[in-house]
């Protein structure tokens, strides 16, 4: 399973890379807005840090606008993947971008039907949002399972990026189901390293060692 880090903060990305756990980066307009650098400059800086896909999202609502933005973003670096919203216009854009050899990540997916349409349009990645579904009482694990089954049934090459991850349980669920990728904040990456029994064991080992050296 691959881990992408869900942030546009350069320091967080560097820290994740230093841990050896980051295979790519996902950003969105909200994350970009928190940073001080201009959008395209920020994406270029991220691409220098990470040896993997970097998702950058278009903000146009119509297909021609999305395609124009996408081509500009894709020219920044070959690592750039274009995030496109799951709309009818978005699907038109994905079809055109796919034909032009530009990789796409269809975002804001909340149903298996949406994922199916994105894959059929030629999306390189689809991003179902698990946390937001769980927030409204929908079992997001069922969605991931359905998407993976559909893609397997028809041999779609689109990779599933589990997004809107709230914590370690979402990562575990995604791994158990066989999702290709989870995109997660640095905070959650750090949480994955923790277990109270690990901390307790370390404390005991150190205490025993100190007794030995006294």
Curated annotation (Swiss-Prot):
Keywords of the record: Cytoplasm, Pentose shunt, Schiff base, Transferase
Active site: 83 (schiff-base intermediate with substrate)
CDD domains noted in UniProt: Transaldolase_FSA
Protein name per Swiss-Prot or TrEMBL: Probable transaldolase
Pathway involvement of the protein, from the record: Carbohydrate degradation; pentose phosphate pathway; D-glyceraldehyde 3-phosphate and beta-D-fructose 6-phosphate from D-ribose 5-phosphate and D-xylulose 5-phosphate (non-oxidative stage): step 2/3
UniProt source species: Desulfotalea psychrophila (strain LSv54 / DSM 12343)
Main location: cytoplasm
Cellular compartments annotated: Cytoplasm
Enzyme class, broadest EC rank: transferase
GO biological process, any: pentose-phosphate shunt
Similarity comment text for this entry: Belongs to the transaldolase family. Type 3B subfamily.
Pfam families documented for this protein: TAL_FSA
EC number: 2.2.1.2
Catalysed transformations (reactions): D-sedoheptulose 7-phosphate + D-glyceraldehyde 3-phosphate = D-erythrose 4-phosphate + beta-D-fructose 6-phosphate
Gene Ontology MF, one: aldehyde-lyase activity
UniProt xrefs under NCBIfam families: fsa_talC_mipB
InterPro entries: Aldolase_TIM, TAL/FSA, Transaldolase_3B, Transaldolase_3B/F6P_aldolase, Transaldolase_AS, TSA/FSA_arc/bac
A GO CC term assigned to this protein in UniProt: cytoplasm
Organism superkingdom: Bacteria
Function: Transaldolase is important for the balance of metabolites in the pentose-phosphate pathway.
